[in-house]
Curated annotation (Swiss-Prot):
Reactions this protein catalyses: Hydrolysis of DNA containing ring-opened 7-methylguanine residues, releasing 2,6-diamino-4-hydroxy-5-(N-methyl)formamidopyrimidine; 2'-deoxyribonucleotide-(2'-deoxyribose 5'-phosphate)-2'-deoxyribonucleotide-DNA = a 3'-end 2'-deoxyribonucleotide-(2,3-dehydro-2,3-deoxyribose 5'-phosphate)-DNA + a 5'-end 5'-phospho-2'-deoxyribonucleoside-DNA + H(+)
Function per UniProt: Involved in base excision repair of DNA damaged by oxidation or by mutagenic agents. Acts as a DNA glycosylase that recognizes and removes damaged bases. Has a preference for oxidized purines, such as 7,8-dihydro-8-oxoguanine (8-oxoG). Has AP (apurinic/apyrimidinic) lyase activity and introduces nicks in the DNA strand. Cleaves the DNA backbone by beta-delta elimination to generate a single-strand break at the site of the removed base with both 3'- and 5'-phosphates.
Co-factor binding comment: Binds 1 zinc ion per subunit.
InterPro entries: DNA_glyclase/AP_lyase_DNA-bd (IPR015886), DNA_glyclase_Znf_dom_DNA_BS (IPR015887), Formamido-pyr_DNA_Glyclase (IPR020629), FPG_cat (IPR012319), MutM-like_N-ter (IPR035937), Ribosomal_uS13-like_H2TH (IPR010979), Znf_DNA_glyclase/AP_lyase (IPR000214), Znf_FPG/IleRS (IPR010663)
Keyword Zinc part of the UniProt annotation: yes
Binding site for DNA: 109, 131, 174
Signal sequence extent: none
Gene Ontology molecular function terms on file: 8-oxo-7,8-dihydroguanine DNA N-glycosylase activity; class I DNA-(apurinic or apyrimidinic site) endonuclease activity; damaged DNA binding; zinc ion binding
ZnF bounds (FPG-type): 265-301
Pfam families: Fapy_DNA_glyco, H2TH, zf-FPG_IleRS
Source organism of the structure: Rhizobium meliloti (strain 1021)
Protein name: Formamidopyrimidine-DNA glycosylase
HAMAP family: Fapy_DNA_glycosyl
Disulfide bonds: none
Amino acid sequence: MPELPEVETVKRGLAPTMEGALLVRAELRRPDLRFPFPENFANAVAGRRIIALSRRAKYLMIELEGGDVIIAHLGMSGSFRIEKGPIEAGADPATPGAFHHPRGKDEKHDHVVFHLDGGSGPARVIYNDPRRFGFMDLARRSALADHVFLRGLGEEPTGNALDAAYLATRFAGKIQPLKAALLDQRTIAGLGNIYVCEALWRSGLSPKRSAGTLVDKRGRPKQALIALTERIRAVIADAIAAGGSSLKDHIQADGSLGYFQHSFSVYDREGEACRTPGCHGTVARIVQAGRSTFYCPHCQK
């Protein structure tokens, strides 16, 4: 599933084509994705100019003039691609947000087509989703904080609001395993399995450790929590700079792959040597709450 860096990469890839363009028509090729489209969705967005693209957690936000926002989630296999100019057979489109190594975009899975008119001429932004776990919704910008998909989300790992003092308030007294606490979207919005594993390895912290052990008796963050916060922010920044992780379906807006997977230190490296200097441990895989966790039992305590 696309995580925050992948969705950020998709947003940045789509923005040059979509921002400022007129959304001439929304072509829905089926009545639903994971959920039904909102009633009158196509008519509601047609003829509106796209003001900006933004992101909240793992959600792509397409902001329209007039105060409406299209909320899009890529699910497990969703991707966008851009086709520019007149429709021509055999055109080679750019792919702004898939997710594995190059995979053919079977047109039978093209479920939504946004027909645009921008400064460089007509374009089509096509949403392709073989498994149909993605979805789209339409909401008023003024009501986003209370939207069912967005309310209760925690701080973004890319902003200054995520600091050790904030995490201390969330972790104090918790016996919950550290990995589970970090995956709680009410604490950190958009942080997923891959990057939690990597941040914990960089911090030398076991995913099985109780979250509350990183907070002192006065509720203040211990040095380990301060370091963990810095590592979380760093691993997300590194992944965004690399264009995400090409694990299952993620491809950048220009069709190239994300390359952060080449920087994985523990994720998906079960049985391989730990990359911590001086550590002679081996990366292990365990299952926590139904999710694979990769870590080094030797150096992560």
